[in-house]
């Protein structure tokens, strides 16, 4: 599995949860995101390789889910953050169902304290390591 296949798999999973998908380095986020809810994938980083012609690769993944956040009550903000956390858990669980994905390790999810763009969105950010066959 290549990083392109992994990104496409994450695109399909995020789209299945009704998120508009975007992928580029984080500095492009303010100019690229034009609709919400949005999923932003930082290009996966190849962290480790085991084997020469076939074996395992470990990719570090950063996936952000964003929703409109202007004028939300504290209760509504907390509810939406909880929804996004559950969605991220679902996406990474579904990712392991692909036959080329061995496992997802070191998954951490945290709410962001400030907006990525000037739209005033709220977001949850997930980082994980995906171990895949090649």
List where the protein language model places each region:
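A short, hydrophobic beta-strand-centered structural micro-motif
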Residues: 34-45
């Amino acid at each position: 599995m290549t990083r392109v296949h992994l990104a496409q798999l994450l695109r399909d999973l995020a789209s299945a949860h009704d998120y508009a998908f975007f992928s580029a380095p984080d500095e492009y986020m303010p100019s690229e995101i034009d609709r919400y809810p949005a999923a932003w994938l930082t290009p996966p980083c190849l962290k480790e390789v085991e084997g020469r012609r076939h074996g395992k690769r470990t990719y570090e993944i950063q996936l952000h889910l964003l929703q409109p956040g202007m004028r939300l009550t504290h209760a509504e903000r907390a509810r939406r953050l909880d929804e996004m956390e559950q969605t991220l858990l679902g996406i990474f669980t579904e990712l392991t169902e692909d036959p080329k994905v061995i496992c997802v390790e070191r998954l951490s999810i945290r709410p962001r304290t400030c907006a990525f763009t000037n739209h005033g969105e709220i977001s949850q950010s997930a980082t994980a390591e995906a171990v895949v066959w090649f």
